[in-house]
Amino acid sequence: MILLGSTGSIGQNALSLARDFRLPVEVLVAGHNLSLLNAQIAEFQPKIIVIADSSRASELSLPKDSKLLFGEEGIIESLHLAQSSFVLNALVGFLGLRPTLESLRLGKTLALANKESLVAGGSFVDASKIIPVDSEHFSLWFLKSDKPFSRLFITASGGAFRDTPLEEIPLQKAQAALRHPNWSMGRKITVDSATMVNKLFEILEARWLFNTKSVDALIERNSLVHALIGYPDGSFSAHIAQADMRLPLAYAMLGKLDQPLGPPLELERLAALSFEPINPSRYPLWNLKEKLLTHPWLGITLNAANEVAVEKFLEGKILFGEIPRYIERSLERFSMIPASIEELFALDSEVRQFAHKL
């Protein structure tokens, strides 16, 4: 396995499965958590390791005959050097797009947890060759058959501020936004869950993966129903499972799963099941949903502006309520359709420069 993003929550879950099912790991790619990476290296003995910063190379304890690479170019080189045919892209942010494109170009099997690859680069990615790892898209894939459908639904937990009084939400700081009610995730995706940007991303991902604009989302507070498919006859199918990222990862890594990964879901827990609409008064960015489905190339601008805003928010430079302004102003300024992957990367850079000045 080639694991891009080994020290994040997805990467750690993937390595838990690799341990349980004795799967070899050839490549580990990580950012700055080198203490955890060292523990992973000691256990899995990868042949190739990639880290973000070459100046920290001395902090690593490397296996004999292993190769150490650095940065984005190192990630791409590792894809070429590795013999493994399976790639799990669990990188965070726009950084994940180029490795996605290169993995597919090299004919490798790609399990995708990097949302931004499709959000920003969906026009240039062959989504039919991707194994989805997001719990929602895995659930749609699990449910989907040749039977015609009328609508796809994914679910949201509502994030950290789902019950916060509306007037208090704009004043919130990072510490409060990082208290997700259901999932243990990375910092950026937890903030994206609170703004509902994460669900906008997933709506766009579903559009590319399943080739439909008929995608919507609902709040299901327990994170037990991950997706639903509506049929022309008015009936629905739902995928119900524990909130455990190892389930979609297991199908991606193993191809199938014929044993439980944990205790079975107690059906009594479904007694309190309910679905709520996503209220734009609480999640103002949700107003962008139809615009993004109609003009999916705007995902490039959405993603770039959001990354800048979330970084500033996590650094304490802006309050939670200022995040939408960065995105809305950027979308007002940039609406062009990139004609090539080079234009896409140029647009991403231009949006970031604009957003940094806001």
From Swiss-Prot:
EC code: 1.1.1.267
SUPFAM superfamilies, A to Z: 1-deoxy-D-xylulose-5-phosphate reductoisomerase, C-terminal domain (SSF69055), Glyceraldehyde-3-phosphate dehydrogenase-like, C-terminal domain (SSF55347), NAD(P)-binding Rossmann-fold domains (SSF51735)
GO BP of this protein: isopentenyl diphosphate biosynthetic process, methylerythritol 4-phosphate pathway involved in terpenoid biosynthetic process
Protein name: 1-deoxy-D-xylulose 5-phosphate reductoisomerase
Family in the record: Belongs to the DXR family.
Cofactors: Mg(2+); Mn(2+)
Reactions accelerated catalytically: 2-C-methyl-D-erythritol 4-phosphate + NADP(+) = 1-deoxy-D-xylulose 5-phosphate + NADPH + H(+)
Gene: dxr
GO MF annotations in UniProt: 1-deoxy-D-xylulose-5-phosphate reductoisomerase activity; manganese ion binding; NADPH binding
Domain of life (superkingdom): Bacteria
Organism, scientific name: Wolinella succinogenes (strain ATCC 29543 / DSM 1740 / CCUG 13145 / JCM 31913 / LMG 7466 / NCTC 11488 / FDC 602W) (Vibrio succinogenes)
The keyword NADP belongs to this UniProt entry's keyword annotation: yes
Positions contributing to NADPH binding: 7-10, 31, 33, 114, 116, 186
Positions contributing to 1-deoxy-D-xylulose 5-phosphate binding: 115, 135-136, 157, 180, 193, 198-199, 202
